[in-house]
């Protein structure tokens, strides 16, 4: 069995090669990048592989995304239409994502930013927290990671509501689905956490009309994909005070350009796409287990429905 690793970062290619060689000692694992000679492989693992991989390396039976999300592959016109695409499921990312979102929700609920302002002004004043029962936290996207985040926040006593394309039932979470229930979902979100996959249906979803359905003074947290948001509309909502703040971990262009207004906006908090970093060792174990199942002719989870984009 031959496994090819394609990743834009050399360090990641080396890590994946080392892990997969250890986990599947009978396999030949090799790295490939544009410009390398043609070859053959049974399985491919990578990130932003580019059309050249599928032209140069023949025999690939399935492609495994080496990070969260598969839009980097679905947006590649050279990706073979009949090649199975398999996504990572958690692989150590759910805990990181939950911690990131919990931190932001706690900061917002307990008004930490206002206390920091008061410190700079030498003001000693206790602030009354809002009633927790009315402090709705919405998680938009209830896949493996979204469901984990919703459950973690619910466990801390926040009233959590979740939204998904298809109906879901999750204990302790008020679940909404479909276009008809979206307005009611948004209306109850004092904090809205975006965890949607990037698809044709979700690209530029979060614009002026969408944001206007959130309660006045709501906060937005985006840990999914930057292209979900129309940036000018978000800035307008922040400038007007319609939104109280936004925490952004992902952007339409990364790294974020130095002159972008997000950098210095007083109502924006920025992190450099670190809400859930791919843990190669855990991810490789998951991929290796799935390859072993495929070799035995057994079904695997995480197979992407390309018509839906996830």
Task: Mark where each language-model region is.
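Glycine-rich NAD(P)-binding loop of Rossmann-like domains
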Residues: 115-148
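NAD(P)-binding Rossmann-fold cofactor-contacting core
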Residues: 156-172
């Amino acid at each position: 069995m031959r496994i090819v690793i394609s990743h834009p970062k050399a360090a990641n290619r080396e890590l994946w090669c080392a892990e997969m060689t250890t986990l599947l000692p009978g396999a030949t694992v090799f790295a490939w990048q544009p410009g390398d000679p043609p070859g053959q492989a049974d399985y491919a693992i990578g990130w932003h592989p580019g059309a050249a991989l599928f032209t140069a390396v023949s025999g690939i039976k399935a492609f495994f995304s080496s990070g969260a999300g598969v839009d980097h592959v679905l947006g590649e016109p050279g990706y073979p239409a009949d090649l199975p695409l398999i996504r990572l499921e958690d692989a150590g990312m759910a805990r990181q994502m939950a911690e990131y979102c919990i931190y932001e929700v706690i900061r917002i609920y307990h008004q930490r930013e206002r206390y920091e302002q008061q410190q700079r002004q030498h003001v000693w004043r206790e602030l009354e927290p809002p009633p927790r029962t009315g402090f709705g936290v919405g998680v938009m996207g209830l896949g493996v990671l979204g469901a984990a985040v919703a459950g973690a926040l619910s466990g801390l006593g926040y009233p959590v509501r979740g939204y998904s394309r298809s109906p879901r039932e999750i204990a302790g979470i008020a679940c909404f689905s479909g276009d008809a229930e979206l307005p009611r979902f948004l209306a109850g979100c004092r904090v809205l956490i975006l965890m949607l996959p990037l698809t044709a249906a979700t690209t530029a979803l979060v614009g002026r009309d969408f944001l206007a359905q959130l309660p006045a003074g709501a906060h937005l947290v985006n840990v999914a994909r930057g292209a979900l948001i129309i940036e000018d509309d978000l800035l307008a909502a922040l400038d007007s005070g319609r939104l109280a703040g936004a925490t952004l971990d992902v952007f339409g262009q990364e790294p974020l350009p130095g002159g972008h207004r997000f950098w210095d906006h007083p109502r924006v908090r920025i992190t450099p796409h670190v809400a859930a970093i791919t843990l190669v060792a855990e991810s490789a174990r998951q991929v290796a287990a799935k390859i072993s199942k495929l070799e035995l002719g057994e079904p695997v989870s995480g197979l992407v429905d390309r018509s839906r984009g996830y």
